[in-house]
A protein has these predicted regions:
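The conserved beta1-alpha1 loop
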Residues: 56, 61-63, 223-224
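C-terminal catalytic histidine-bearing segment of alpha/beta-hydrolase fold enzymes
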Residues: 246-287
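N-terminal cap/lid segment of alpha/beta-hydrolase-fold proteins
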Residues: 21-53
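Short substrate-entry loop that stabilizes the transition state in hydrolases
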Residues: 53-55, 64-107, 197-198, 229-230
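Alpha/beta-hydrolase
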Residues: 61, 98-100, 191, 252
Length: 287
């Protein structure tokens, strides 16, 4: 797929799909699965359309900025998964939502990331916190994503050659790193990746620029205009355009009243991004 980078200003549980040209009844309850990341036993939610498959699959990387291990983007993390899954399944995609170490159903496998970072800031200051966040993102947190992708491809219901990765906020950063690591991914979609960190962390900027340089999958950057900052989407998309690599950028009008509202557009205004995301995924996973 060849897309020029463009700039555009541009839940109800659905039971029948319309995006694939045929009806697929959406299962309400997920399957809970377990996979290994090193010595850890991590959990994941899994949904798929009815039928034997194999289906194209989307792995979703949740954020890590909630007040505790059970929340993301201001809502329970399990509810976040349940809010998104029907949208992907109705378009014909299996949806895999791994809980990384220390969070959600994997909270018993490690300390919650924010607790670790807050302790680091209290002992050594904000710069030390940012550096530790970067280190953990590029090591153990990324390890969990890579392990989840490997596990997902072993499932008999999945077409292992048609897998995409998506993510929100911190999970959006991991999505870019996964796209760099895994040359077999067919598409990557980030929602509000690095919106709070891009301008204050030179090492993060350098690392994500390197990631998009090396990634082979088409990348879609999504943000609302009132996110904390949209510089990351603008800068990364501009770099991909310079390199003549396939990408797309969507910066939508403001959502809600605050930067946090804009940051969490993935959960608060699904109809705003749904058409763009599935057009992009459909093109990427059928090329």
């Amino acid at each position: 797929m060849r897309l020029a980078c463009t700039f555009v200003f541009a839940f109800t549980l659905a039971l029948l799909c319309g995006g694939t040209g045929h009806s697929l009844r959406v299962p309400i309850a997920p399957l809970t699965m377990e996979f290994h990341s090193g010595n850890l036993h991590l959990k994941a939610f899994f949904w798929k359309p009815n039928g034997p498959g194999p289906f194209p699959a989307v792995l979703f990387n949740h954020g890590s900025g909630g007040p505790d291990a059970a929340h993301t983007a201001g809502i329970p993390i399990t509810q976040a998964a349940e809010r998104l899954a029907p949208v992907f399944v109705k378009h014909g995609y299996a949806f895999f939502f791994p809980f990384r170490r220390g969070q959600g159903l994997s909270a018993d496998q490690a300390p919650f990331l924010q607790d670790v970072l807050q302790r680091e800031e209290a002992e050594r200051g904000k710069e030390a916190r940012e550096h530790l966040k970067f280190v953990l993102m590029t090591t153990e947190q990324l390890d969990d994503v890579v392990a989840a992708l490997a596990f997902l491809r072993t499932l008999p219901e999945i077409d292992s050659h048609r897998v995409a990765v998506t993510g929100h906020s911190f999970g959006g950063q991991l999505t870019l790193l996964a796209a760099e690591r895994d040359a077999d991914l067919r598409a990557a979609v980030t929602f509000a990746a690095a919106a709070e960190s891009w301008e204050r962390s030179p090492e993060l900027r350098e690392r994500l620029l390197t990631a998009v340089h090396k990634a082979t999958a088409p990348i879609l950057f999504i943000q609302a205009a009132n996110d904390y900052s949209t510089a990351v989407s603008r800068d990364l998309a501009s770099e991909l355009e310079r390199l003549q690599k396939p990408c797309l950028k969507r910066i939508y009008p403001p959502v809600g009243k605050s930067a946090e509202d804009g940051h969490n557009v993935i959960y608060t205004d699904i109809p705003l991004w749904e058409d763009d995301v599935f057009k992009f995924l459909n093109e990427g996973l059928t090329r």
